[in-house]
Amino acid sequence: MQNIRNFSIIAHIDHGKSTLSDRLIQTCGGLSDREMEAQVLDSMDLERERGITIKAQSVTLHYKAKDGETYQLNFIDTPGHVDFSYEVSRSLAACEGALLVVDAGQGVEAQTLANCYTAIEMDLEVVPVLNKIDLPAAEPERVAEEIEDIVGIDAIDAVHCSAKTGFGIENVLEDIVKKIPAPEGDPEAPLQALIIDSWFDNYLGVVSLVRVKNGSIKKGDKIKVMTTGQSYNVDRLGIFTPKQVDTTELKTGEVGWVVCAIKDILGAPVGDTLTHQHHSATEVLPGFKKVKPQVYAGLFPISSDDYEAFRDALGKLSLNDASLFYEPENSTALGFGFRCGFLGLLHMEIIQERLEREYDLDLITTAPTVVYEVLQTNGETIYVDSPSKLPPISNIDEIREPIAECNMLVPQEYLGNIITLCVEKRGIQTNMVYHGNQIALTYEIPMGEVVLDFFDRLKSTSRGYASLDYSFKRFQTADMVRVDIMINSERVDALALIVHKDNAAYRGRELVEKMKELIPRQQFDIAIQAAIGNHIIARSTVKQLRKNVLAKCYGGDVSRKKKLLQKQKEGKKRMKSLGNVEVPQEAFLAILHVGKD
């Protein structure tokens, strides 16, 4: 056990943690050169295409150190994107240390900071590594100072390495062995194993990734999931080298996978504790905090026959992604579907793409909203995650919107633009600290503004140099209203949105104009209106297509023409009372892009 080291790799997006993991695997001979490929741990096609890590992956390697001992290194590669910070906190719960990878050209960024503080809160040993040292723009000395200034950990002896060329990788491994403590735990105690992650395999059922804290787990053991109290037989267990390799036992301090023929998706929840059925532990291991979704959106299958398949797909996906929340919902415009909760917009996009790719579904998404706290006139407080659930105006005493605390790290030259952007998003500055050329800004910005397009706008105003980390702070009273879109005086529930009163007229007008472009012309006029309650704030009309009924009248009497026009008018009137308007799929997506251009 003294020779085991468990650690995670944490870093900002694109600072090279997946490439560093590749080098560690190669150096320790986890895979032969033939099997080696770039970003070997990003196993999902989506991860490779976008060049980001979405799921944390674990690997067990054996490293013969300079002191002659062979060490077992269990490491977990984590995502760097702010939407997947939950994956990071899960991975850190299973480790004793973390490698903080910082790009020697870019320096410290907001996500580096956020993940690093999470690690320090969990009492992990943080080992700084300066990566991309081979770049002409690399300034390791400046970045080392920055790490000390901003993060507050000693970085003078930080290893300089280049994951791409393989320079300095040996030193990184030596640092891991020397600086990260060995796991603590009692091999004789009853088994306690923390479930870090689970996923569904069509042949094996539920596969769980576990970290053994106390005791050991062998093939054929009878184990029990502590919160549900259900017992299972251990069929297979093993480690990842990144390939799945079977072993007969996982000892104290090790990280590996376990298959117990669990068919029920909820059988082994992430963050739960496994123990032996007969010789069981008395208390559950401290898991990790359950995250609350920040963004909600309705997902509906385009054809209603796919509803069952969609439900099963969500179940399997939520096993693999514990931060996904879903509940059934039905809409008059779109039929049956699910209301899903996500951690952010990137998370929402990724989930939608995974459902469409891995489970072959066609889905429509409604506009994302955040959760509002509504105080009703009868004194009751309710939480609203969808505009259609908002009670009538007469029953509402006040609406409170969620406020996010945004920490940004910004280069000096872009400060002006970013302050303008934050003010436009109704932000209030709470702090500003200069660290050399970087400025740490703290703003309180309504969550609804942050999740929509704040991140994209922040990146474009700062040419990609500013970085952001946000977290929910509190609910605060605000003047929010619900804008309904009416087509031929019928409300379309899927197009409603909750906005601040000051922006309502502008957002309503913009949406109405957008809908006008997207709804095809019919044989009669279509009125598109935006309304707050019964008060219309914007209107636009899609003009009718009409046949020229006078084409065959040459000269002749005017009363003949009047008769034909009158007849056409009556026909149109009858049509309008009977006709209904098909709203195309693009129109629902238009909401997502209102205010972006």
From Swiss-Prot:
Keywords: Cell inner membrane, Cell membrane, GTP-binding, Hydrolase, Membrane, Nucleotide-binding, Protein biosynthesis. GTP binds at D14, H15, G16, K17, S18, T19, N131, K132, I133, D134. It comes from the Bacteria. It is a peripheral membrane protein. InterPro entries: EF-4, EFG_III/V, EFG_V-like, EFTu-like_2, G_TR_CS, LepA_C_sf, LepA_CTD, LepA_IV. Its main location: membrane. It is found in: Cell inner membrane. Residues 2-184 form the tr-type G domain. GO terms for molecular function: GTP binding; GTPase activity; guanosine tetraphosphate binding; ribosome binding; translation elongation factor activity. One of its GO terms (biological process) is positive regulation of translation. Disulfide bonds: none annotated. Its EC number is 3.6.5.n1. PROSITE patterns: G_TR_1, G_TR_2. Pfam families: EFG_C, GTP_EFTU, GTP_EFTU_D2, LepA_C. It catalyses: GTP + H2O = GDP + phosphate + H(+). One of its GO terms (cellular component) is plasma membrane. Belongs to the TRAFAC class translation factor GTPase superfamily. Classic translation factor GTPase family. LepA subfamily. PANTHER family: TRANSLATION FACTOR GUF1 HOMOLOG, CHLOROPLASTIC (PTHR43512:SF4), TRANSLATION FACTOR GUF1-RELATED (PTHR43512). HAMAP family: LepA. Required for accurate and efficient protein synthesis under certain stress conditions. May act as a fidelity factor of the translation reaction, by catalyzing a one-codon backward translocation of tRNAs on improperly translocated ribosomes. Back-translocation proceeds from a post-translocation (POST) complex to a pre-translocation (PRE) complex, thus giving elongation factor G a second chance to translocate the tRNAs correctly. Binds to ribosomes in a GTP-dependent manner. This is Elongation factor 4.
